Amino acid sequence: MEQMTITAKIQIVVDETDKVLLDETMSVYRNACNYVSDYVFRTHDLKQFSLNKVLYSTLRENFNLKSQMAQSVLKTVIARYKTILENQNEWMKPSFKKPQYDLVWNRDYSLTQNCFSINTLNGRVKLSYFADGMSKYFDHTIYKFGTAKLVNKHGKYYLHIPVTYDVEESNVSDICNVVGIDRGINFVIATYDSKNKSGFVSGKAMKQKRANYSKLRKELQMRQTSSSRRKIKAIGGRENRWMQDINHQVSKALVKNNPKHTLFVLEDLSGIRNATERVKTKDRYVSVSWSFYDLEQKLIYKAKQNQSSVIKVDPRYTSQCCPCCGHIEKANRNKKMHLFTCKNCGYKSNDDRIGAMNLYRMGIDYLVDSQVPNTVVTE
């Protein structure tokens, strides 16, 4: 068994009285985070014990935080600093702009009699909720709740709850199906599986929509007004949500349309942002900013839920190698025509399909001999 964690997003029903209590608590929590962030930035201290020793009394007295809230503020700030250090490798002070509140399970929030009980600065409030397919996660004999985040989005309140549960591990010996997945621009994905079946998800409409977003963003940037900057931010959020929804649908379909114990094989595209020189200028925005990583992560956790696995392999020559005779030559591929023609044996097919076929073959090689340290990167 291995553990898996997903985030359940649950809307809670808030009346005007409860809204005042929640807003006040979230605002004070946010202000306390900024206070602690200032101190951490000056001292470079990221230890919970020493921060608690110096700041706990101030958080309790000056911000009127309850004991657990004060501890949670410290953890929230420490986590934010560590994330910045991991991603940017430099010392920067994070600013907490939006009101927020991190709630510890069974201390700051609990679930009783079909209501969430949430702690505020002025006592607990009991709130009903809309499950929207999330009620299955409320069986605490199977699912364990973690520290939730309370957010206010366009006047609606949500609990983002990390839910952890056990899933059966997928062993190499159990694999019964292999799917090679080639990701790109003209086709979001092209697939090839153990039944010799190919599949395609066209990227034409998505490519056009992203180009429209890019054009609109450039037009707004030229105006350089506060209104245009707000619109640019709103467009960015809209585009990201749209992209994430597409990746959710694609990854869900991949898992749903394949049996348990499937091995999904992806190219390791970790260097995609540094590969713009190999992409047509008009396609660079689409290629470089396309959320390959988001699709990859969504597929990984959905595959685990279905007792399946994902591996990433070296992408070199996957578009130049003939899957029939193994001949590798750059001239095999006509990028403009999206056509692959082997100069050795004459085999012809769509170039994205060829990529998927070669990834499928590498998946088979992995199953035959999993000791391929220079080629295969397992998750």
Each language-model region and where it sits:
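Gly/serine-rich nucleotide phosphate-binding loop at the start of the catalytic core
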Residues: 1-75, 92
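Positively charged, helix-rich recognition surfaces that bind polyanionic ligands
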Residues: 4-8, 16, 20, 154-379
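Generic detection of short hydrophobic beta-strand segments and adjacent strand-loop junctions
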Residues: 4-12, 123-132, 136, 199-201
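Short coil/turn segments at secondary-structure boundaries
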Residues: 38-43, 50-51, 88-97, 226-233, ...
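Acidic carboxylate diad motif detector
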Residues: 51-156, 289
